[in-house]
Each structure stands twice: as C-alpha cells, then as structure tokens.
C-alpha cells in the first residue's frame, strides 16, 4: 500500500484524536477562549486566511459563518500580504490557518501586521504544530491533532476543517 492511501485510511483515527482533544479540559479551554474573543470583542468581521489547502478550509469556513450571519471573508494569505492588508483593522478577528504553522505568506503577514498594529490585532492560529511560528505568534491557537504527514495534506486537511467548524 502506498503512503498516500495509508494516510487517507488514518483519517478516521485522526478525527477521533482531534475530537478527543477538544473534549479534554485543555481543548475545551482553547475553544471557549476563541468563542469568548468573538462574543466579548468589538469585532466587525472575521477574516480567514491561509495558503493551498488551508485557504480552501478558510473558504468553506467563511461560507458557513456567513450562513449564520457572522460577517466572515476568506482571503488568500498572499493577497493579504501583498495587496489587501488594509482590510485588516483592530476590529478584525483574523483566523490564520497553516497546517505546518510555517507557511511563508502567513508568517510574513503576521510579522508585518505585528509591526503595523503593534500586536493590537487579534489572531487565532489554526495549526497542526504546537511549536510552530504561527502558534507562537497568534493570540490564541487551535491545534489539529493529525499527527505526522509525509504526503500531501490528507489528515491535516480533514482535521483542520473539523477544528475550524
């Protein structure tokens, strides 16, 4: 069996692991903290961003949020970095998604925003890597529990989608 098929077959286990984590005390505290940010903050919109499959998760999440009358937009991290960063204000809740937590555009965007906003922009990072740059730079981080991945995003895509949902 090739590695790609093996990782696809591991998806149910990784979904169970991720759900188990968010049913634990630590996981519940992380989710509650994000919900508290949105409900108590003075935000006028949520902007979700990422690259590649992380951006595809952003698009799906923004669509779901708008169905619940939450003002949400998905913007590719490269577009935000180079052309559209002016849409991000202190009243924006930014959800930055990167399975590795090291996507160049996402990290560079956060560096630039940190300089421009002096850390007043609230960032929720969603990543599979707890020790990543994204996890360190985010106001709060939500962790995927997909384990190690050697091929294209399979386990991380599905667990990221679950976490953002």
Language model features with spans:
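Cofactor-/ligand-binding subdomain signature composed of acidic, glycine-rich
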Residues: 1-41, 161-162
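Glycine-rich phosphate-binding loops that contact phosphosugars or nucleotide phosphates
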Residues: 40-165
């Amino acid at each position: 069996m090739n590695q790609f098929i093996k990782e696809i077959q591991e998806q149910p286990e990784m979904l169970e692991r991720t759900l188990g984590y968010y049913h634990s005390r630590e996981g519940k505290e992380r989710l509650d903290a994000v919900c508290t940010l949105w409900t108590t903050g003075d935000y006028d919109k949520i902007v979700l961003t990422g690259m590649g499959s992380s951006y595809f998760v952003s698009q799906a999440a923004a669509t779901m949020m708008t169905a619940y009358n939450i003002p949400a937009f998905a913007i590719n991290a490269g577009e935000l970095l180079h052309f559209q960063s002016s849409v991000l204000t202190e009243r924006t809740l930014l959800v930055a998604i990167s399975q590795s937590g090291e996507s160049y555009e996402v990290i560079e965007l956060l560096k630039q925003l940190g300089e421009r906003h002096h850390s007043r922009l609230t960032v929720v990072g969603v990543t599979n890597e707890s020790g990543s740059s994204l996890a360190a730079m985010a106001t709060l981080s939500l962790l995927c529990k997909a384990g190690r991945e050697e091929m294209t995003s399979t386990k991380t895509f599905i667990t990221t989608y679950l976490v953002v949902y």
